[in-house]
From Swiss-Prot:
This is Argininosuccinate synthase. One of its GO terms (molecular function) is ATP binding. It comes from Shewanella oneidensis (strain ATCC 700550 / JCM 31522 / CIP 106686 / LMG 19005 / NCIMB 14063 / MR-1). L-citrulline binds at residues 96, 101, 132, 136, 185, 194, 270, 282. L-aspartate binds at residues 128, 132-133. It catalyses: L-citrulline + L-aspartate + ATP = 2-(N(omega)-L-arginino)succinate + AMP + diphosphate + H(+). ATP binds at residues 16-24, 44, 126. InterPro entries: Arginosuc_syn_C, Arginosuc_syn_N, Arginosuc_synth, Arginosuc_synth_CS, Arginosuc_synth_type_1_subfam, AS_cat/multimer_dom_body, Rossmann-like_a/b/a_fold. The gene is argG. Belongs to the argininosuccinate synthase family. Type 1 subfamily. One of its GO terms (biological process) is urea cycle. PROSITE patterns: ARGININOSUCCIN_SYN_1, ARGININOSUCCIN_SYN_2.
Length: 407
């Protein structure tokens, strides 16, 4: 199950390590195929849950790693990646809030930082050769550490299945809690959890209740709606129900409030970067509430041209994030440009949560361009409706000229 030794002078490798079956097998495989190089395991804590980190260091060392670095990125992830992305209005193919995609650049950056710290000359990831993540990670590595060799075992070794990996570890007396039966492939962070594989590979199959792990089934959610208040400053949620919170804490509180109401579930078939389509079920409870609140305030404060521009930026940004182009000049420019609009996104929103829905039902902002006096359908003293006639004649002038020329 090994390959011909492909060592090209690699002495120390930093592996993006999760403790799962794949990365547990990668550690001994690297030693065998890269001249017994030193393996440094690296795990990014992006809010996937404490249970995922318990015993991780011991497991990495038992598999053959010399060190294991667990880096807490939760606050930075929300503050510097999730919030800026949401400020652009990015949403991939009209539905996906990019939970997995946003996590990849910060993980890759931290992995490079660990590599620099320990003096490594190579980076390794456990992404398959069919997915988006291989491109995302290696694109970030190219931008941040083009001098470091990148090793992608799934594109090199001959193992094809979980059974192969389990047999490989058993041959080397490396213990694992994994089993041959794994129904779904899941990826979690503070923002969301994704589910792929199993019955989901057939788009004619409705996801079973066992797919979802974070949110309640909307059918089983409370019959009584719950209202949650969000206060926003410069496009960032700063308070939830009147309580001042850090970015990460605000997201966690919204997750806890929205998940029991079944908020944030989507089932989509998306276009992968590598060309194929894939089906995924995503749960993003707190992020869905945040997105609804930010859009509600934008409705009040952005004029027509600004909102149109933001929508264009959001569409472009969604593809950049999804395609792993975070560390590019265009991404940097779009993020910076969006900040100027975010300066006016201030106010308070009340979101109603009910059986899978998150609807902004109240909103106010000190920067609001909405004027009840101008918008009213009743009698008013500030807007003379006769003024609209001249505007309409000028607005439709091109159409009028075109029609006259056609006669």
């Amino acid at each position: 199950m090994s390959i011909e030794n492909k060592n090209t002078g690699v002495k120390k490798v930093v592996l993006a390590y999760s403790g799962g079956l794949d990365t547990s097998a990668i550690i001994p495989w690297l030693k065998e195929n890269y001249d017994n190089c030193e393996i440094i395991a690296f795990c990014a804590d992006v809010g996937q849950g404490e249970e995922e980190l318990i015993g991780l260091t011991e497991k990495a060392l038992a598999s053959g790693a010399s060190e294991c670095h667990i880096v807490d990125l939760k606050e930075e992830f929300v503050k510097d990646y999730i919030y800026p992305t949401m400020a652009t209005g990015a949403i991939y193919e009209g539905t996906y809030l990019l939970g997995t995609s946003m996590a990849r650049p910060i993980i890759a950056k931290a992995q490079v930082e660990v590599a620099r710290k320990v003096g490594a000359d190579a980076l390794c990831h456990g992404c398959t050769g069919k997915g988006n993540d291989q491109v995302r990670f290696e694109g970030c590595f190219a931008a941040l550490a083009p001098d470091l060799k990148v090793i992608a075992p799934w594109r090199e070794w001959t193992m094809q299945s979980r059974e192969d990996l389990l047999a490989y570890l058993a041959e080397r007396n490396i213990k694992t809690s994994a089993s041959a039966t794994k129904i779904y492939s899941r990826d979690a962070n503070a923002f969301h959890i994704s589910h792929e594989g199993g019955e989901l590979e057939d788009p004619w199959n409705e996801p079973s209740k066992g797919v979802w792990t974070l949110t309640a089934d909307p059918e089983d959610a409370p019959n009584q709606a719950e209202y949650v208040s969000l206060e926003v400053e410069n496009g960032r949620v700063t308070k939830v129900n009147g309580e001042a919170l850090t970015p990460y804490a605000a997201l966690m509180k919204l997750n806890a409030i929205a998940a029991p109401h079944g908020v944030g579930r989507i089932d989509i078939t998306e276009n992968r970067l590598v060309g194929m389509k894939s089906r995924g079920c995503y749960e993003t409870p707190g992020g869905t509430v945040m997105f609804a609140a930010l859009r509600a305030i934008e409705e009040l404060v952005l004029d027509k041209t600004s909102r149109n521009w933001r929508e264009q930026v959001g569409a472009q940004m969604a593809h950049l994030v999804y395609d792993g182009r975070w560390f590019t000049p265009l991404c940097k420019s779009l993020l910076a440009a969006s900040e100027s609009l975010a300066e006016s996104v201030n106010g308070e929103v009340v979101v109603k949560l009910y059986k899978g829905h998150a609807i902004a039902v109240k909103k106010r902002s000190p920067n609001s361009l909405y004027s009840e006096a101008f918008a009213t359908f009743g009698e008013d003293q500030v807007y003379d409706q006769k003024h609209a006639e001249g505007f309409i004649r000028l607005y439709s002038l091109a159409s009028r000229i075109r029609a006259l020329n056609a006669k």
